[in-house]
Amino acid sequence: MAKHPEVSLYKELTDIQRHVTQNAGTEPPFSGKLLHNKKSGVYHCLCCEQPLFMSGTKFDSGCGWPSFYQPATHDAVQYLDDDSHNMHRIEVRCGHCNAHLGHVFPDGPQPTGERFCINSAALSFTDENTGEKTVG
C-alpha cells in the first residue's frame, strides 16, 4: 500500500485539506470549490498530482460533493472497507500516495452504476484548454 505524502507537505495544506486527505475527514456539503466546475480537464490528487478522474465522467448527483462514475485508470484509486459511523461504506484513496478522497456508492449512472463521491479539498483540477490549475 502506498504511503502518505512527505511530512513537509503538511505545511502546505490548509486545515480542511489536511483534515480530509490525512485524517479521512469530510468537507461540508456544497462547500467545495470544484463542485460546480464544468470545464474539461483532469482532476488530480491534491497531495501527489496523480490523475484521478476525467471531467467527462463527472456528473451532478445532488449530494453536495463532486461525483464521478469512474476513475481515470484502474489503479488511480484504491478501495478500503469503512465501517465508521455505524454503516458500511467503501472508502476511496489515492492509488499513489494513499490520501483519503471520499467514498464510492452503487447508485451512480451507467455505464458503471457507481458514484464516486469525492471531497473537493482532496483534488486539484487542470483545465485541458488553458492549463490553468484550480485547487479544491
Curated annotation (Swiss-Prot):
This is Peptide methionine sulfoxide reductase MsrB. The keyword Protease does not apply. Zn(2+) binds at residues 45, 48, 94, 97. Belongs to the MsrB Met sulfoxide reductase family. It comes from Photorhabdus laumondii subsp. laumondii (strain DSM 15139 / CIP 105565 / TT01) (Photorhabdus luminescens subsp. laumondii). GO terms for cellular component: cytoplasm. Its cofactor is Zn(2+). The keyword Metal-binding applies. Keywords: Metal-binding, Oxidoreductase, Zinc. One of its GO terms (molecular function) is zinc ion binding. Binds 1 zinc ion per subunit. The zinc ion is important for the structural integrity of the protein. It holds the Pfam family SelR.
